[in-house]
A protein has these predicted regions:
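Membrane-spanning helices that line or support transport/gating and their immediate boundary helices
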Residues: 47-54, 86-94, 98, 102, ...
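A hydrophobic transmembrane-helix motif
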Residues: 29-32, 36, 76, 80, ...
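Cytosolic ends of transmembrane helices, especially the final helix of ABC transmembrane type-1 domains
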Residues: 206, 217, 234-238, 244, ...
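Membrane-integrated ABC transporters
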Residues: 1-41, 46, 50-70, 84-88, ...
Length: 335
């Protein structure tokens, strides 16, 4: 909650200004391109059914029309992605410019930079202005766009998947059960389990990333100190002492790096398994209906696509976990 309050404190002057309508228009355009690309994805899911049914029926006459239709969908989706990315970069730079000017004024106004140098708080203001602000603007916009894309994708495909799931009847321990939309529940259960495991595996990443930024900044500050005081270091023959300080700070980076890479190794192992298992889950889930001939081959392919989209939506936290951790680490530094 404290992190969210700090982020809102940083974002409010830019997004809450009366003259920021251009930025809101940019954001609305980005969302518009995102929503239209989702609409095209729904069209492609319907195309999957027609294409694979025609393929299973060896219907060569339908293929040219279907291929041209698919190329049209792809052209529209690519256009949406490219335009959305271009507008996103413009918006990120506008926000970065606003934050940079604001932080520079706060840092230099009233000789505050001198007083901060004496007290040592906060650490490395140069990094906060030059790097952290850009990372904050970029990661915030990227995550927001990803979240909107996820909500739209879920809203578009959950109804399709529910309808394709039909009504399933099964018996367990002598009791009969009826399940509607069972593929939706399979996607939810798989994503919930994956999200819990992702959090358990990567829960230390945030603190390690924050610590990494501090240690990297301390090392850069020590290097700058040697450069700025090169004459004194040479005159007093302090090269050995400075070398010792630099090595000490670099050893702190190395210690953090070891712990961070160990944590990332566990996270990446989980992620690699998660991605590959996710490919087979929709096939396995729809296989009984296909073998029972309640689904055509085209239905199975459309179900596979819809299942993947819904499962992606449920698993947004898992997919975005590392980006969320990196965003939290960056948002915790400026202030």
């Amino acid at each position: 909650m404290a992190l969210l309050k700090q982020f809102l404190h940083l974002a409010r002057p830019f997004w809450g200004g009366k003259t920021q309508w251009r930025e809101w228009l940019l954001l609305a355009s980005i969302i518009g391109f995102t929503l239209f690309s989702i609409f095209m994805s729904v069209k492609i899911a319907a195309w999957d059914k027609r294409f694979y049914d025609a393929l299973a029926a060896f219907d060569g006459k339908a293929m040219p029309t279907l291929i041209v239709e698919y190329c049209g969908y792809m052209a529209l989706i690519i256009g949406c992605i490219v335009c959305g990315d271009w507008l996103q970069k413009r918006l990120v730079f506008r926000w970065r410019t606003h934050l940079t000017e604001r932080f520079q004024q706060n840092w230099l106004g009233g000789h505050k930079h001198y007083r901060l140098q004496l007290t040592g708080e906060p650490d490395n203001p140069d990094q906060r202005i030059a790097d952290d602000i850009y990372q904050l603007a970029d990661k915030s916009i990227v995550l927001f766009r990803s979240f909107i894309n996820n909500i739209a994708k879920f809203s578009a495909f959950v109804g399709v998947l529910w309808g394709l799931s039909g009504v399933q009847h099964f018996t367990l321990w002598g009791h009969s059960f009826t399940v509607r939309g069972y593929l939706v529940w399979v996607a939810l259960a798989y994503s919930a389990a994956s999200t819990l495991l992702a959090h358990l595996v990567g829960r230390r990443l945030k603190d390690l990333n924050i610590d990494r930024q501090h240690r990297e900044a301390d090392y850069r500050a020590a290097l700058l100190r040697v450069r700025d005081h090169a004459e004194q270091v040479a005159f007093y023959q302090g090269a050995d002492a400075e070398q010792g300080r630099l090595q000490q700070r670099y050893r702190r980076i190395l210690d953090n790096w070891r712990r961070l890479t160990n944590c990332e190794f566990r996270q990446e192992t989980f992620w690699a398994a998660y991605v590959r298992i996710s490919i087979f889950i929709p096939i396995i889930a729809t296989l009984p209906m296909y073998l029972a001939k309640t689904l055509t081959f085209g239905d199975m392919m459309q179900t596979r696509t819809s299942f993947a989209r819904v499962q992606d939506s449920f698993g947004w936290f898992t997919d975005s976990y590392r980006r969320l951790v990196a965003w939290a680490a960056v948002a915790a530094r400026p202030g």
